[in-house]
Amino acid sequence: MHTKDLTTGSPMKLILSFMLPLVFGLLFQQVYSMVDTIVVGKFLGVDALAGVGSTGSITFLVLGLCNGVCAGFAIPVAQKFGQRDFDGLRRFVGNMIWLSCVIAAAVTLVTTLLCRQILLWMDTPADTFSYAYDYIFVIFLGIPATMLYNLLSGILRSLGDSKTPLVFLIMCSLLNVALDIVFILTLNMGVAGAGWATLLSQLISGVLCLYFIVKKFPILHLKRDDLRLRKIYVRKLLNMGLPMGLQYSITAVGSILLQTAVNGLGATAMAAIAAGSRVSMLLVCPFDAMGTTAATFAGQNLGAGKLDRIHQGVKDCTVLGIIISAAIFVITWFGGSAMTTLFLDTADGASVDMVVPMGHQFLIINAAFAVPLLFVNLLRFTIQGLGYSEFAVFAGVFEMVARGAFGLCLVPVLGYTAACFASPAAWVMADLFLFPAYFHCMKKQGYSFKPTKVSAATE
């Protein structure tokens, strides 16, 4: 069993040791996501790339809801682990299994039935519509597989094990690459093949994760009584999971409004943002990993009653995040064009000449605002680890308003440049809420921000 106690020892060392496997895992996850896009762009053309890219915001809305719920469900597990209440831990796991099955079934049914209408509402251009529909329908069919992996990996991380999910994710990534090549290049399945490759690889990753838990984690071996639904546990799980899921979905609504506006700019702009977004998501993987680490670190230390360690962890992550932000900007400045070119068919010179400069512009603008994005992830997830998931919803509202305003008001007037500034504006808006929210939540838990000895945070 590979659990890790985050309530003792140096916060910085613990954060780094927990975070690094997450970074590698997210990098692999983004790589196999990028493979879909690269293969589609190079072998199926710009219209296919634009079609797949245009589904990003609606996919983020739906999968963000599911993944956010899973992340929220894992927080009470981390808190119980910090308290060393293993009976309560298993009851939470048993109740979250039932809730996850219901949510996965409901979301899959609704999204597969409505995905065509959703694309119509988003004004998806006719020349990219079929590509978008073929891809997103398969992705929605795979929601149960996505939730299976995210639920199980979230449970393992809440116990301090960030390495086991990494191993299975690497295997999943390599399988995804192989299936992409087989389905698209050999079987000529088109963009649907990319979707099926993602679905099957996630399913296999989830099943392997389940097998490992059964074999190696006796702390998670459930009895019949653990699977009994209990109102107090269901209420706690829903109070944590639904706000986190809604936070992602609310944020995605703004992205959908923005994507709708971008769709009106044509296939070239759509392809540039699709390629730029993929590269950007790869570069900011450390921030995503930091957020997951912060939630687990805060959850365990809250359970142990060590609020001073939580604040020290936030300060350590801030220093680390600023260094990462500088590296992201340097990489983007010198390598952004080359990375954007990966997604395009270089034989189509006209498309490359138009899309690459626009994609690089998108990357530079977003990289310049990496520090605000750092705090969005760090503070939001720390607040969630403290048990205040409802604040994540409000942060999502701020992001939605900013992206929606750019999409509805500025993109039609200022064009592509306004679309590039939409996400940075959303991050800044969210930070204006998250900073006071963090201090409020810590004080509400009884923490005083008066200077303390360093040893108090690290003992």
Label each residue range with its predicted role.
Residues 1-19, 77-142, 186-242, 298-369, ...:
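Short alpha-helical transmembrane segments in multi-pass integral membrane proteins
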Residues 6-43, 57-72, 76, 101-108, ...:
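N-terminal transmembrane alpha-helices
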Residues 49-109, 146-165, 272-336, 373-387, ...:
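Small-residue-rich hydrophobic transmembrane alpha-helices
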